[in-house]
Amino acid sequence: MCGESVSKTECLKIMFKKILIANRGEIAVRVIRACHEFGISTVAVYSEVDRASLHVRKADEAYSIGPAPASESYLRGDKILEVARRTGAQAIHPGYGFLSENANFAQACADAGIKFIGPTPKSMEMMGSKTRARHHMEKAGIPFVPGTARGLTSTEEAEEVAERVGYPVMLKAAAGGGGKGMRLVHARNELRSALESAQSEAQRSFGDSEVYIEKAILNPRHIEMQILADEHGNTVWLGERECSIQRRHQKVLEEAPSPIVDPEMRRRMGEVAVKVAQAANYTNAGTIEFLVDQEKNFYFLEMNTRLQVEHPVTELTTGLDLVHLQIRIASGEKLPFAQSDVSIRGHAIECRIYAEDPDNNYFPSPGKIDVLLQPSGPGIRRDSGMYEGWTVPMDYDPLLAKLIGYGTDREQAIMRLQRALDEYFVAGIKTNISLFRRILRDSDFRAGKLDTGFLDRMLTKPEADPATSPPEPRIAAIAAAMFAVLDPSNSVTKNGNAPPQLASQPAASNWKQKGRAEALR
């Protein structure tokens, strides 16, 4: 577990005894499980609406840090550090989102003598701003999309750069992510209003109105490379992830490896990714994102200085546990393998299961989960933060779980994932499960013909013949029957007595009904 150079006993001696997880949902559960596998005690933090959340139930200790708004709870680094000090936590794992890429919080952890499981504040600050990152990468000779390496100072400057690189161009928030502060501009007469709009949205979303401009690559693929770097100067790449299936610039389905990346291209992308990380003196887990044009040229986009939502597809195709490795790196251990030891085996595809209503433009769908049937079986992994009876709050990102299918090749991964999606059933709230069933049936997806516009095009196509769709009514009927039997108000009571029978119904045996109920539990 701890590598050839360090025995398991020695490794556990130098490891942390207690880690605080500064996050919620499925990623908090994921990190808690990794800690427990090492015998490390865990501390959860939660907002008032998350008191009954799964991560709170799984942790060894849990502490409230404030009201529902993230600005009063999960973004309050001072409260989180106070809990860490009070509980004796030696390290903090930030997960993704919230404070995971906040250099000030990472510095506050260092000042408090608590290890931040991630990069140094200096590396995070360098790569956290897209304009700063582009400036440093330009000096390091890293290829990036033509445009500005610094924020725009005026509309006139934007017009000058746009004329030089050629329309269409993309405006992007320097501190951005998730599609916020981004505008596609096709002509000069659109530029002024688009710039004002992008700057305004960037200020609202990130507290920073800085925007830069770059040439828009038409129909690009979004492909990223996972890296790991220890604190002894060793950096390796772990293969790419195809992240082109997006909605509103946010990923919804990812896979590894990419259908278009051959071994030579993978090696070149990996070497550039390592060069990026080394230029930033980067340590721990990180991801370098690239745009890839139709000629398979790739350009540096940005670096995510944290664990990614989609890390499971890399874990399945490399056989490595990235959270284990994050903890080991943070505890001072060298990487237990070299680049030559890394191999890509099989294929993995991840679906992000959201509490969203596909019939209402994917609007968030909070509420109580009345029935939950989750899939399993060969080649299926679930990273979940939900359970039956839990109420999904409206205050956070609606990600409920991640469903990952793994196979010896892409075709088998798709087959397994389709079967698992057909088994998945959630009642009480809306989810986007039906969207993934549709994606996996799409002929372009099956052929690997992907780019960032794939999903928009697919959603304009007519739905498949209902006869070829999965038997959702049958699944719903089974789930409803289970719910009816398990609900004491509808069926057998706890003392074994059946509810009153209608005159037209034959009397049911209390023992039989009790047995059926127990069999379904």
Could you describe each region identified by the protein language model?
Residues 273, 312-314, 318-521:
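Catalytic cores of soluble metabolic enzymes centered on carboxylation/carboxyl-transfer
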Residues 5-7:
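Serine residues within intrinsically disordered or low-complexity segments
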Residues 12-288, 292-308:
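N-terminal beta-alpha lobe that positions the nucleotide/phosphoryl donor
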